[in-house]
Amino acid sequence: MGTVVEKAFRGEFETHLTVRPDARTVSGARLERWAGHHGLKLTRIVLDRGAMPDQPMLTEQGRGTLAEQRAAARLRSAELRAAGFSVVRVKIEAAPWNEDIPRTADEAAELSPVCHFEHHIKLLLSGEPEVASARAVAQRHSAHLSRNARRAARHARHERFVTQRCRAVGRPEARARLDALLGALAAAGLEVTEVEEEFVVHDDHPAVDAGWIDERTEQPVGERGQRRPEVTV
């Protein structure tokens, strides 16, 4: 294994702070009040399966370098702990157009093994059969489902999110895998409403997601090159 190169990834970032859920955090709305007071976005992610399916998460936008985002995350984590919350994970994602985003597998191999492309696809589904269909498609593409527990259903339809991870590849290959997943979702008749591409540059506790996504290195034969559906981003 070669030497890991520390990059700045200068540009736009999102920092996600996952808080351990408990009765006071979730039911008592303490975290919601704290987030509102500090100008952070609160999302309560519920994974479809895994070791820690309930994941209250605070999100903060930032610009600059990875080192600056890490420093800001340390300060924010200290504030949360001082307020009585247990921060179990800090995850920092760079925009795919930032500096130093890998274009090839060789460039990706120079980075920390925690670095990878991550794609988030929002679906609007109706009924358990569509959820089961989305789950089956996702599992064939190094992806799986989650939902936002704070988002109410709309007109008997509800949102699900598909998260796909692509490791040890450059952005063109990651985009090809995303396109294959989108094509498979469209072929299954599932409605895609949003697509987001990110590049994970820091994750201090990836085991929080243990048992959720069964990651593969190859996309399914027969689904390569499928046409990407039109979406609203």
Roles of regions detected by a PLM:
Residues 2-233:
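Long, contiguous binding/interaction regions
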